[in-house]
Curated annotation (Swiss-Prot):
Topology feature Virion surface, residues: 38-44
Annotated compartments: Virion membrane; Host cell membrane
Membership in a protein family: Belongs to the rubulavirus small hydrophobic protein family.
Membrane topology: Single-pass type II membrane protein
UniProt keyword terms in alphabetical order: Host cell membrane, Host membrane, Membrane, Signal-anchor, Transmembrane, Transmembrane helix, Virion
Organism: Parainfluenza virus 5 (strain W3) (PIV5)
Function recorded in the entry: Inhibits TNF-alpha signaling and seems to block apoptosis in host infected cells.
A GO CC term assigned to this protein in UniProt: membrane
Name by which UniProt lists this protein: Small hydrophobic protein
Transmembrane segments: 17-37
Intravirion side: 1-16
Amino acid sequence: MLPDPEDPESKKATRRAGNLIICFLFIFFLFVTFIVPTLRHLLS
């Protein structure tokens, strides 16, 4: 059963999931940006 798109609760849950995904991608981007050069420096 798909939730009713007009249901404000399902809309809120969808937006919250989107925010979590955006936050995860942002943290992942920062992790890659800072950790990868550090590891490369340590391993070289």
